[in-house]
């Protein structure tokens, strides 16, 4: 799991399969079970730590197919959504699109200190909830 560089939605992460796999149907039964556990853990963390009302999960493989010889690698995006603004280090981040689909071109500028705060708080949750 990686914290996305783009924090257009506070806590936005990407889950990446450790081995190469080109699509969801390629997951083993054990990987499906592990994915479910991880989805539950991450979503609970985002709700508990930052107050997310819900999380949108997506497996977007389109970018790989821009290449002449596509070689997709399974990864899943999580975009937490917030009914109430997120407060980080005194800065307020409202989710002005709450209740609507996410914007493809939304800017996610947050300060380096706030990005670090998101990373630390989410990492602490993930390590505590093993």
Q: For each predicted feature, which ranges?
A:
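HIT superfamily nucleotide-processing domains
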Residues: 1-130
């Amino acid at each position: 799991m990686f914290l996305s560089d783009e924090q257009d939605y506070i806590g936005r992460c990407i889950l990446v399969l450790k081995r190469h796999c080109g699509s969801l149907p390629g997951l083993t039964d054990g990987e499906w079970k592990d994915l479910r556990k991880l989805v539950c853990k991450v979503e609970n963390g985002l709700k508990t730590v930052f107050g997310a009302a819900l999380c949108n999960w997506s497996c977007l493989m389109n970018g790989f197919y821009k290449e002449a010889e596509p070689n997709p690698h399974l990864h899943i995006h999580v975009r937490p959504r917030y009914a109430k603004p997120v407060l980080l280090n005194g800065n307020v981040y409202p989710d002005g699109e709450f209740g609507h689909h996410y914007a493809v071109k939304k800017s996610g500028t947050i300060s380096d200190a706030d990005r670090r705060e998101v990373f630390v708080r989410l990492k602490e949750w993930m390590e505590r909830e093993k």
